[in-house]
Amino acid sequence: MEGPAFSKSPKDKTIERAFLGVLGILFVTGGLASRDNPHQVYNITWEVTNGEQDTVWAVTGNHPLWTWWPDLTPDLCMLALHGPTHWGLDNHPPYSSPPGPPCCSGDAGAVSGCARDCDEPLTSYSPRCNTAWNRLKLARVTHAPKEGFYICPGSHRPRWARSCGGLDAYYCASWGCETTGRAAWNPTSSWDYITVSNNLTSSQATKACKNNGWCNPLVIRFTGPGKRATSWTTGHFWGLRLYISGHDPGLTFGIRLKVTDLGPRVPIGPNPVLSDQRPPSRPVPARPPPPSASPSTPTIPPQQGTGDRLLNLVQGAYLTLNMTDPTRTQECWLCLVSEPPYYEGVAVLREYTSHETAPANCSSGSQHKLTLSEVTGQGRCLGTVPKTHQALCNRTEPTVSGSNYLVAPEGTLWACSTGLTPCLSTTVLNLTTDYCVLVELWPKVTYHSPDYVYTQFEPGARFRREPVSLTLALLPEGLTMGGIAAGVGTGTTALVATQQFQQLQAAMHNDLKEVEKSITNLEKSLTSLSEVVLQNRRGLDLLFLKEGGLCAALKEECCFYADHTGLVRDSMAKLRERLNQRQKLFESGQGWFEGLFNRSPWFTTLISTIMGPLIVLLLILLFGPCILNRLVQFVKDRISVVQALVLTQQYHQLKPIEYEP
């Protein structure tokens, strides 16, 4: 067999490839920016392109980012569409049937319009794709033990691979550039992103070619480095060459990733946050329908404002509390907390559902990371939970097998280290250090007894204790969905209470939506402000004065910047002036002794140091003489007593003598 134009023995190629493979592994970062919610599902499309970067094969699925790595199975001839002329498909349109006449049968062409007999011996002409007979010869080459094909990377190769050439050599200008393929020396690599091989056996390919179909399908699999790369949205390219006698024909192909959101998020109109700040709408009195046989036109309910949403939160909390414990609502006050955190979570132990395909709510993830700053209780945890949060776990599942989607029960959410989400991807959970806790959301509504409210209106002379307030999530009985559902066994109002709880959950869900819209509008406002500030209007207007100014030269709408920093400086100056006045007023009310401490810092230190000894000395001078006199008098009295005892010991008492008359 005649060697190729840059022929080397397979043994030499194996040694050189092994030497080059030790030089390192290429890690590619960048590309698609990481999204906020790693469990959110997107519409992902893997596209295989030809040398003109036209899509010739694609596969689509709904999965989280960087979790779906399917096998790509394009046909080798599809990669040659609009490619080099020697492949015979330079004018063949993509996504169409194979070109050319079919093969003839074994008996001298019984099929009308056939080209030649596929059972006859194949000549040494180069394999092509324009007829069934040529595609059959291509299949024989790609499956032959001493022939085949090899792949060379182009866009992501390391620096030492500069000798591999460019598009003219299909990135395979020298031996050692090949990283995968199906050839006699079995080319491999430890850093390339893909492996390529045949997807059919020789007999299966022969049968498909004789039926005038695409009969040279490849199977492209992603390697470990390829799954770690995040630059697939820009695309990567490779070269493919056949290993045959003479010059090795080749082509180039690419692989790229296309990501789109499942649901559109299109803002309409000006900033909706400012126009949405409306008070609670008044209820419209019900009117009887007019007597008419014509059907009434359904009316669209007005959009709720901020006041309506806040009132719905308090009303939903009251209805839930009233149906579960009516004694607490006979006389009470429910207050919606007006400062963060606005919500608190209660960990619950409930059963989730597992799905093989992504449900609809998995694509409705938030655009921003919402964090719960207060979570109580014990519930179900997934992933590797740190020690600081293990107190929230009643049951922990470190890993979840398979590649499924875990949907939280109705009325609950997964509180993860990456934010709140209604759906989890086990693939993301097992590949990352993320952990999640199943929680129920409760608005920060404070429960007050009537005594607390009454004391607020009593005279100020009465001493008021610090109020003991409880939020709904911290009430002794607990108002979680699990606790409400437990009342079904005892009858009573469990079903109605569950409906009230769901109404409260719906109110919280609407409020969270508005919070997300507010964050989005704030982001857009900051972006718009930064664009305005970056325009150096004054200087550029002078440069483009002949064209009518900067806006006329750029053909853009003029932007104007309202600078309020001067007002801020004036306010700060007035604040400093008031502080100085208060300081002078405070100093004028001090006595001369207090003023000494404010004049010099060393004087304060000196006084505090010698004050103790001076006080002790003063006390000694005042009370020392009196104490000394009393002590001397006491000693004299004791000495007099001792002297009297000594004198009495020298004399004896005489007994009286009685004389008889």
Swiss-Prot record:
Region named Receptor-binding domain (RBD): 32-267
Sites where the protein binds Zn(2+): 86, 117
UniProt topological domain (Extracellular) ranges: 34-606
Keywords associated with the record: Cleavage on pair of basic residues, Coiled coil, Disulfide bond, Fusion of virus membrane with host cell membrane, Fusion of virus membrane with host membrane, Glycoprotein, Host cell membrane, Host membrane, Host-virus interaction, Lipoprotein, Membrane, Metal-binding, Palmitate, Signal, Transmembrane, Transmembrane helix, Viral attachment to host cell, Viral envelope protein, Viral penetration into host cytoplasm, Virion, Virus entry into host cell, Zinc
Motif residue range(s): CX6CC: 551-559
Listed GO MF terms: metal ion binding
Signal peptide span: 1-33
Record note on modification: Specific enzymatic cleavages in vivo yield mature proteins. Envelope glycoproteins are synthesized as an inactive precursor that is N-glycosylated and processed likely by host cell furin or by a furin-like protease in the Golgi to yield the mature SU and TM proteins. The cleavage site between SU and TM requires the minimal sequence [KR]-X-[KR]-R. The R-peptide is released from the C-terminus of the cytoplasmic tail of the TM protein upon particle formation as a result of proteolytic cleavage by the viral protease. Cleavage of this peptide is required for TM to become fusogenic. The CXXC motif is highly conserved across a broad range of retroviral envelope proteins. It is thought to participate in the formation of a labile disulfide bond possibly with the CX6CC motif present in the transmembrane protein. Isomerization of the intersubunit disulfide bond to an SU intrachain disulfide bond is thought to occur upon receptor recognition in order to allow membrane fusion.
TM region positions: 607-627
Annotated lipid attachment (S-palmitoyl cysteine): 626
Residues annotated as site: Cleavage: 465-466, 645-646
Short sequence motif named YXXL motif, residue ranges: 651-654
GO biological process: fusion of virus membrane with host plasma membrane; symbiont entry into host cell; virion attachment to host cell
Disulfide bond sites: 77-129, 103-118, 104-114, 152-172, 164-177, 209-215, 332-335, 332-559, 362-416, 381-393, 423-436, 551-558
Subunit: The mature envelope protein (Env) consists of a trimer of SU-TM heterodimers attached by a labile interchain disulfide bond.
The protein, known as: Envelope glycoprotein
Gene: env
